[in-house]
Amino acid sequence: PDVSREQQLQSQELGALLNDFLATLSDENRRIFMRRYWYGESIGEIAQRFRLGESNVKTKLMRTRNALRAFLEKEGVKP
């Protein structure tokens, strides 16, 4: 099989899983996660935007990353 085609399918599959995971999050946690990892905003910018302390934002991101890791492992995705 064509390696690039296989990689493309894996990317699409991973993207679909990520969307499924994001749908499980609260609106606030999803928006914080997207601001950090999709838009590349700093912790400080996110804290200001959501009127939260930086430590609160860091905790939310850590918990969301841990939940994502567990979700992907449950779906059979290896790190």
Locate the predicted segments by residue.
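DNA-recognition helix of helix-turn-helix
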Residues: L18, N29, W38, I43-G44, ...
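Acidic, proline/glycine-rich intrinsically disordered inter-domain spacer in sigma factors
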Residues: P1-A23
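ABC transporter NBD signature
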Residues: S26
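Short, contiguous strand/loop micro-motifs
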Residues: R5-L9, R30, S55
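Intrinsically disordered, low-complexity basic tails/linkers immediately adjacent to helix-turn-helix/homeobox/MYB/SANT
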Residues: K78-P79
